[in-house]
UniProtKB/Swiss-Prot annotation:
Region (G5 motif): 241-244
Keyword Nucleotide-binding: yes
Protein name: Interferon-induced GTP-binding protein Mx2
Transmembrane segments: none
Native source organism of the sequence: Ictalurus punctatus (Channel catfish)
Upper taxonomic lineage: Eukaryota, Metazoa, Chordata, Craniata, Vertebrata
Region (G1 motif): 39-46
Binding site for GTP: 39-46, 140-144, 209-212
Length: 625
């Protein structure tokens, strides 16, 4: 059964669906299933496409394909029928004579990429409906060049490679690589580029051209390539013979070319087996490509619909951020500004309570705050550990330096005070450092909310950020003052008697436990741990008091410092920002200035509306399919 009989009913709808989505512009938002044709210069790429489409394409030296060309071929049931249509940018024109196609493409390229030799990534769409073409759509890409010629830019090679990679990198693209038989396939730039983006050759298909130019003795190498024995490609290879330069000069018809191609392979002693195995000729290539494209489309469609839904949701969310634009009526403008500022304030307040922030999904400041508060606890623990290690040494040094007329064994409260105050003082600057870090964090988060709530309104954004910055400075100064006052109070040395007694008792119990373990005794030793009559015993007693009190201080500061910082820098800053932003609404003189919109925003909003429209249409197409 022939291809047209077996697949006609499902082939064309599949290809038409993707062509329709591409015509809608969906490819601006998402990659669509496609066959991209690439090849080095003089690889025979244009000849292959001419043989498939039945129309002459631009030829010449240098890069002749200067824009991606979407070649849509539609098989007509009418005998000897031909019709063409070219579309690019906002231009569309019917083509009645196939002889006009080449000139029409050149004209389109000149209008898009200029009259020189530059290239562009803007798509030209050529539709050919004929009884002599397969149902197939391919995208022809500029040939790969290494050296600039004539008016080409010096970096034309890099430009062409970037454009090609833009297409062939997409997982939805089948890469059709055209390679001449008379070159070493392993050195061709086109195949190298294809395998860079598709290392396993899963979506790469090779076409070998110019078999009539193969050197004698090299034929079996070509056969090995086609049989996938040299450079493996999952989709395999096929070999074709198209019109040569002399045949083009002699104006040999494409129908005659197909006949000559068939005769060439049937009569060739080496390539005949390839023809018998349907691995040769343009008709077999057309059939293979159509089947590959239809299968590829069928495999991509379920995921495509899902991706369109996701993109549509993202587009709607972005449109919500930009809003519907500024109203023109004065009263409506006031309401508009009020709504924007209210939404911003609500986001700020929600941020301070850990609730959902509307303008920025998943934004939550508390994990970062907890990290900072954990660092503060680490500061406390670090100073405490250092204190415990050097406490006895410090007491001995202090006693030697400051002991007066008193006999050994008399415990001075002043010694206790001086040592404790010295340790507490070491905690003050780490607390201020945490304040600065958290202050910067809160400013960043508030500023992000301002950016997400006021896109396109630079004056409101600037005003909000100025207020955030000013409030940060004021509240940071106030909070620093409170913290320093807290540390001044800590210098008074105070806790409830019972608190100190209980803590001391617990600490002594732990120390005695350690002593028992050290002595290897199950019960308490006969002498008390601190019942010494010499200065060492006194120092041990004082050590226990110092450790006990310092642990009380660190427990107090572990909570107090974060509570002060969180209340002043987060809660109070948010409340002050709320008051000052509301004041903006009440000052009617600045409303016009505040509502001046960024000139790019209207354009972005229009682009988003266009995207939303084409994606919605795309879903309708998919639903009907």
């Amino acid at each position: 059964m022939s291809l047209s009989e077996q697949y006609e009913e499902k082939v064309r709808p599949c290809i038409d669906l993707i062509d329709s989505l591409r015509a809608l512009g969906v490819e601006k938002d998402l990659a669509l299933p496609a066959i991209a044709v690439i090849g080095d210069q003089s690889s025979g790429k244009s000849s292959v496409l001419e043989a498939l489409s039945g129309v002459a394409l631009p030829r010449g030296s240098g890069i002749v394909t200067r824009c991606p060309l979407e070649l849509k071929m539609k098989k007509s049931r009418k005998a000897d029928f031909w019709h063409g249509k070219i579309k690019y940018e906002d231009y569309e024109e019917e083509i009645e004579d196939p002889a006009d196609v080449e000139q029409m493409i050149r004209k389109a390229q000149n209008e898009i990429a200029g009259t020189g030799m530059g290239i562009s990534d803007k798509l030209i769409s050529l539709e050919v409906t004929s009884s002599n073409v397969p149902d197939l759509t391919v995208i022809d890409l500029p040939g790969i060049t290494r050296v600039a010629v004539k008016d080409q830019p010096e970096n034309i090679g890099d430009q062409s490679k970037r454009l090609i990679k833009k297409f062939i990198t997409k997982q939805e693209t089948i890469n059709l690589v055209v390679v001449p038989c008379n070159v070493d396939i392993a050195t061709t730039e086109a195949l190298k580029m294809a395998l860079e983006v598709d290392p396993n050759g899963e979506r790469t298909f090779g076409v070998l051209t110019k078999p009539d130019l193969v050197d004698k003795g090299s034929e079996e190498t070509v056969v090995s390539i086609i049989n996938n024995e040299i450079v493996y490609l999952n989709k395999g290879y096929i070999i074709v013979r198209c019109r040569g330069q002399q045949e083009i000069k002699d104006r040999v018809s494409l129908n005659e070319t197909v006949k000559r191609e068939r005769d060439f392979f049937e009569d060739h002693p080496h390539f005949r087996t390839l023809y018998d195995n349907r691995k040769a000729t343009i008709p077999n290539l057309a059939e293979k490509l159509t089947l590959e494209l239809v299968f590829h489309i069928g495999r991509c469609l379920p995921r495509l619909e899902e991706r369109i839904q996701v993109k549509l949701s993202e587009t709607q969310a972005e449109l919500d951020r930009y809003g519907s634009g500024t109203p023109t009526e004065p009263e409506q403008r006031i309401y508009f500004l009020t709504d924007k500022i209210t939404a911003f304030i609500q986001d700020v307040l929600n941020l301070t309570t850990g609730e959902e922030v509307k303008s920025m999904l998943y934004m939550n400041i508390f994990p970062d705050l907890r990290k900072q508060f954990d660092l503060w606890k680490n500061d406390l623990d670090s100073v405490g550990e250092t204190f415990n290690k050097k406490i006895e040494k410090e007491m001995k040094a202090y006693e030697e330096k400051y002991r007066g007329r008193e006999l050994p064994g008399f415990l001075k409260y002043n010694t206790f005070e001086v040592i404790v105050k010295g340790q507490i003082k070491q905690l003050e600057e780490p607390a201020i450092r945490r304040l600065k870090e958290i202050s910067d964090l809160i400013k960043r988060e508030f500023s992000q909310l301002a950016h997400s709530n006021f896109p396109g309104f630079p004056n409101i954004l600037k005003m909000a950020k100025t207020k955030i910055d000013n409030i940060k400075q004021v509240k940071e100064s106030e909070t620093e003052s409170i913290l320093r006052t807290q540390f001044k109070m800590e210098m008074m040395i105070y806790t409830q008697d019972k608190t100190h007694h209980d803590n001391l008792k617990m600490l002594k119990s732990k120390e005695e436990g350690k002593e028992r373990q050290k002595l290897g005794v199950a019960h308490s030793p006969s002498h008390k741990l601190y019942d010494h009559s010499d200065s060492e015993g006194i120092r041990e007693e004082l050590t226990c008091h110092l450790k006990s009190y310092f642990s009380i201080v660190t427990k107090r500061l572990a909570d107090q410092v974060p509570m002060v910082i969180r209340y002043m820098m987060l809660q109070e800053s948010a409340a002050q920002l709320q008051r000052e932003m509301i004041q903006l609404i009440q000052d009617r003189h600045n409303i016009e200035e505040l509502l001046k919109e960024d000139h790019d925003i209207a354009s972005k909003r229009n682009n988003l509306h266009s995207c939303q429209k084409r994606l919605t249409e795309a879903l309708k197409y998919l639903a009907k399919f």
